[in-house]
């Protein structure tokens, strides 16, 4: 399990899930009081210190608790997290929305991004090769999240709505070719994107010989990945399936 001990992995998983919920730096006292980790507060502190040294946690201020790094989130997603599948009723609702909108690429992507934003409570973006449009929905949702109280962070993220070239770079070039790709602003090197996380899905519109397209969500790095990864994956597969015979 990477270079982490089982105890370190357990502490890291607990800390990440608490951080996803609270949006606050996590201290050893919080973990000790709220969760039965079976070790002393001193041991938790020591393990958190070690996790910081090896790049899984970071401390924003000397007196504050710690938050996960992109490396920690990737380890969590790949080895610790259990996905929560989209309920059948939500799948059916999404399919109906996409099938009803399958009149044109514009209506399809417009309705799909809106539906994805509503389902994930995040900013949703979509793009299709050959189209000079970024479809988007849900920008008001991220403004309620603490990470976007910083006007510079919010402005730079929302500016993507108008930047087709940058969205294509993000979705087609930076994202891997897996069914779902996870991107962290911390890794992009773009100004003010450090607290940002993204989940995207690539697919073909119009079957294997059609056009490459991508849909995804943007939110804080602490996105509830166990929920949103299967949702984004489902939407990508759904659009590909619905348009296969177009």
Predicted regions and their residues:
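Alpha-helical hairpin
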Residues: 3-4, 39, 68, 86
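Intrinsically disordered, acidic Ser/Thr/Pro-rich low-complexity regulatory segments
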Residues: 81-83, 87-246
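Conserved RecA-like P-loop NTPase ATPase core
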Residues: 11, 69, 217
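N-terminal helix-turn-helix
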Residues: 14-21, 25-80
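Short alpha-helical segments that sit at the start of domains
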Residues: 1-13
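Residue-level marker of regulatory loop/turn positions in helix-turn-helix DNA-binding domains and
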Residues: 4, 24, 146
């Amino acid at each position: 399990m990477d270079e982490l001990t089982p105890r370190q992995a357990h502490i890291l998983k607990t800390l990440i899930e608490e951080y996803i919920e609270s949006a606050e730096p996590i201290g050893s006292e919080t973990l000790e009081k709220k969760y039965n980790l079976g070790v002393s507060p001193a041991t938790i502190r020591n393990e958190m210190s070690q996790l910081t040294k090896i790049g899984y946690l970071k401390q924003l201020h000397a007196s504050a608790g710690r938050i996960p790094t992109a490396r920690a989130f990737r380890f969590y997603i790949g080895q610790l997290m259990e996905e929560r599948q989209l309920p059948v009723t939500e799948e059916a609702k999404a399919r109906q929305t996409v099938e009803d909108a399958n009149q044109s690429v514009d209506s399809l992507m417009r309705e799909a991004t809106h539906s994805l934003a509503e389902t994930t409570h995040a900013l949703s973006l979509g793009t299709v090769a050959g189209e000079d449009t970024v479809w988007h929905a849900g920008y008001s949702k991220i403004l309620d999240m603490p990470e976007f109280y910083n006007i510079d962070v919010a402005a730079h993220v929302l500016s993507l709505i108008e930047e087709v070239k940058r969205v294509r770079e993000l979705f087609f070039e930076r994202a891997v070719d897996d069914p779902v790709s996870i991107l962290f602003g911390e890794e992009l090197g773009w100004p003010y994107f450090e607290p940002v996380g993204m989940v995207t899905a690539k697919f073909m519109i119009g079957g294997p010989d059609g056009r490459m397209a991508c849909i995804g969500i943007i939110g804080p790095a602490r996105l509830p990945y166990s929920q949103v990864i299967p949702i984004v994956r489902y939407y990508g597969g759904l659009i590909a399936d619905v348009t296969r015979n177009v």
